[in-house]
Amino acid sequence: RFRDNIITSTDLIGKVASQPVINSVLNAANKSKIMRSVLDKTLAIHKDAILPEYTNKPLLKRPGVVSYDPLNPKSKDESTGADNHSNKVTLFTTCYCNYNEPSVAESVIKLFKHNDIDIELVGREHCCGMPKMELGDLKSVTKLKNANIPLLYEKVQSGHKIVAAVPSCVLMFKQELPLLFPDDEQVKAVANAFYDPFEYLFSLHKKEKLNTEF
């Protein structure tokens, strides 16, 4: 279905919707009763459904954000020093945190840094694939898996744990991908290293290593 293919193409929508002029027009249209009525009649997106706003400053494009880009050799040297720290964490930003609510990911980063945990982002990540999987579009899921897993596996090999602030993304990497690709050793390694942020922080708390002084 055309509508389903569009709304599950989160990378594409995010990239387009975050463009300065398009961003303002789209956010205004999503609040317009007339435009919402048009969407309801043409794409069957209910006129009263709450649609997220899009930022014109995606997290991965913000100055000062530390991200790992395998195509840029200098990106490792520009990291927060995670390679020299006992707690090494990579944040999978997710489409939602990158294009809709960067403040969520920024809060995770601040919380981890408050606990002296060096954290970096994956600069060339793609959607986790959960929206496409819910459509049964396994071809797209495989394509997204092949784009994400090698990047994350490289971080796991260097001793990083991985976290994501969106639960469905955590579920995708920890449970769904291993079920879909049971013979993929890289998928297994990434799944074993993937944590919900609070799960990771609670593991520190149990070891009495969590800084709760704010």
What are these regions (language model features)?
Residues 1-214:
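Iron-sulfur cluster-binding electron-transfer modules in prokaryotic oxidoreductases
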